[in-house]
Amino acid sequence: MDAPTVGVEEEFLLVDPRTGAPTARNEAVAHTAGELGIDLQLELTRCQVETSTAVHSDIGALFGQLRDLRCGVARCAQANESRLLAVAIPPTVPHEFPVTDTPRYRRIAESFGMIAHEQGLCGCHVHVAVPDRETAVQVSNYLRPWLPMLLALTANSAIYRGSDTGYASWRSILWRRWPSAGPPPYFRTAADYDAMVTMMLSSGIVLDEKMVYWDARPSINYPTIEVRVSDVPATVGETVLLAALVRATVHTARRFLAEGNTAPAVPAEVLRAAYWKAARSGIGGDAVAPLDGRVLPARDLLDELLETVDPALEELGDRGFVSDALTALLARGNGAQRQVRAFGADHDVAAVIAELGAATLEGCAPEPANSGGGEHVPVEGRH
């Protein structure tokens, strides 16, 4: 079995450099990015942008491109009186979340009301190559029990509207307001998956297939399984750690399925409990093991995931990177833990913004970008 390729999409928040409040400047930032040759996509609200990488076989190359994209887009934001933050929800009180002015996004806003207008949420999507749609559906079944662990590991949305939410990933709680969001159902075949999507389309639960927001799904545009469970991680290193773990889990799933096995059908109720626990506690508290309902420390469940995917990590050449990246993350905390520390007893939102700004551009030396000249037509993101 060939090593699968991997690609990543990251969503970012644009904020005012002085106040940290979201700024509605995504079209201007995308215009500047286009002049610099950066493919930057618009998201549902005008406070958000999305980057996407090329397809990579090598994790080191993925790391380099993600870092360069963050550095470049940060310069474009700076040129338009904005700051780029890798954070899954706004830490400050937003004045508004105006919807990006495209026909599709206007239709979504008209159909879903306040859910759309409060959408300023940023995630990270990892695409891993699979041979066909049937394989993607079966791999999704295998991934279901591990999705809460991936959420806990990368949680980056503890502070919202000037308050400590008490959750590591408040984004994941808000995100589930969409009728098509959350854990993917268990499907016996790709035909069953397609039948469910057809029902959702005919009922108006989704307006198009791009709005099937399950946390793992066959990609619409690429021959991949797309894993969408994560908050946008605070640092490039954490994003690449996520990508490496997702790729290894997909590779493990394909080996498992090739041996004639069938993924366990974890009950939706157990999976929802595991999701809630992951959102609440992140990597620092307890977790629910979806396969058997055990309650155990999240780090112990992480060890079980690592043990499961270790042969794949070795085969793909990613074991060393994952070991080093996890050691660093667990030593200093993930994005949510660092937000809470910065917020502290003084409820210092400015310190949270400073922490996020530094983490977003780790390894960068951003400089002001020049704007002007030419015409660039921005592209919608994948919401």
UniProtKB/Swiss-Prot annotation:
InterPro entries: GCL_type2/YbdK_subfam (IPR050141), GCS2 (IPR006336), Gln_synth/guanido_kin_cat_dom (IPR014746), YbdK (IPR011793). Pfam families: GCS2 (PF04107). It comes from the Bacteria. Its EC number is 6.3.2.2. Gene3D superfamilies: 3.30.590.20. GO terms for biological process: modified amino acid biosynthetic process. The keyword Nucleotide-binding applies. It catalyses: L-cysteine + L-glutamate + ATP = gamma-L-glutamyl-L-cysteine + ADP + phosphate + H(+). The keyword Nucleotide-binding applies. Keywords: ATP-binding, Ligase, Nucleotide-binding. GO terms for molecular function: ATP binding; glutamate-cysteine ligase activity. Belongs to the glutamate--cysteine ligase type 2 family. YbdK subfamily. ATP-dependent carboxylate-amine ligase which exhibits weak glutamate--cysteine ligase activity. This is Putative glutamate--cysteine ligase 2-1. It comes from Nocardia farcinica (strain IFM 10152). The lineage of its organism: Bacteria, Bacillati, Actinomycetota, Actinomycetes, Mycobacteriales.
